[in-house]
A protein has these predicted regions:
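Class I SAM-dependent methyltransferase Rossmann-like catalytic core
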Residues: 1-35
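Short glycine/proline- and acidic residue-enriched helix-loop micro-motifs
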Residues: 12-16, 154-164
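Soluble or luminal CAZymes and related metallo-dependent hydrolases
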Residues: 18-28, 108, 166-173
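Surface-exposed alpha-helical segments enriched in charged/polar residues
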Residues: 28-32, 114, 172, 176
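Conserved SAM-binding loop
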Residues: 31-132, 197
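Conserved class I S-adenosyl-L-methionine
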Residues: 122-149
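Short alpha-helix
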Residues: 160-180
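Core SAM-dependent methyltransferase catalytic element
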Residues: 182-204
Length: 204
C-alpha cells in the first residue's frame, strides 16, 4: 500500500516504507484500543483508494470520500462528511478516520466531528500532531510552523503532493472535537493524536 501514493520524488520514496510500517502498527493497535472484531460494522471516513481495507481486507468496512474511488475494494459512498452523510444515526458500530481531519477546513471541523459521532456508536480518529517537527505530508522540517507565504515556497522542496491547504491540529483542538486524545510517540515527541471511543462504550 502506497502511503505517499499521491506524492512524488525522492522524499516520498524514502518515507513510504517507514510510513507504511507505522500505519501497520496503528492498524494492529486499532483492535486493541477499540475492541473491534471482524463482525464490527465500520465506516472509513475519508477512505482514499484503500484506507482501512488496504491492511484489513476482511473487515466489514464501508468507505466514504469526497471524490469517486473506482478501485475501492468494497462498498463505497461518495459524500462530504462535513455535511449530512446518507446514513441513519448509529448506522455503524465504529467510525474510522486516519489522517483526514487536518484536510478539513477549520471552520468545517466541528461539522465533520458531529457527523462522525452521529453515524457511529464509537470511533477511532487519528491525525498528525502539529507539535511534531516534521510535516508529514510535505516531509519537510518545520514546514507547518511557517506563515502561509514562506510555507508555500518551502513546500516546493518537499514531496510534491498538493498539501498546501493542510492545517495540523494541536491536542486541545483534537480533544474539543473527539474527546480525550492518546499520544503516538517517536521517542519523546508526539507524532500523532488518536481519539478512541471503544465499541460498546456507554452501553448497558
Amino acid at each position: 500500500m502506497k502511503v505517499y501514493g499521491t506524492a512524488r520524488g525522492p522524499l516520498a520514496r524514502i518515507a513510504d516504507p517507514i510510513a507504511a510500517r507505522a500505519r501497520a502498527r496503528r492498524h494492529a493497535a486499532l483492535f486493541t484500543l477499540t475492541g473491534a472484531t471482524p463482525a464490527t460494522r465500520i465506516l472509513d471516513v475519508g477512505c482514499g483508494t484503500l484506507g482501512l481495507r488496504g491492511l484489513a481486507p476482511d473487515l466489514d468496512v464501508t468507505g466514504t470520500d469526497l471524490v469517486e474511488r473506482p478501485s475501492y475494494p468494497g462498498p463505497f459512498v461518495l459524500a462530504d462528511a462535513t455535511e449530512r452523510l446518507p446514513f441513519e444515526d448509529s448506522a455503524f458500530d465504529l467510525a474510522y478516520s486516519s489522517s483526514v481531519v487536518e484536510h478539513v477546513p477549520p471552520e468545517r471541523r466541528a461539522a465533520f466531528a458531529a457527523e462522525v459521532r452521529r453515524v457511529a456508536r464509537s470511533w477511532y480518529v487519528q491525525t498528525p500532531a502539529r507539535s511534531f517537527p516534521i510535516e508529514p505530508h510535505a516531509l519537510l522540517p518545520f514546514a507547518h510552523w511557517l506563515p502561509p507565504g514562506p510555507r508555500r515556497r518551502y513546500w516546493r522542496l518537499g514531496a510534491q503532493g498538493h498539501w498546501e491547504d493542510i492545517a495540523l491540529l494541536g491536542r486541545r483542538e483534537v480533544e474539543a472535537l473527539f474527546g480525550p486524545a492518546r499520544s503516538e510517540r517517536v521517542g519523546p515527541l508526539t507524532k500523532s493524536w488518536v481519539c478512541v471511543r471503544p465499541v460498546g462504550a456507554g452501553e448497558a
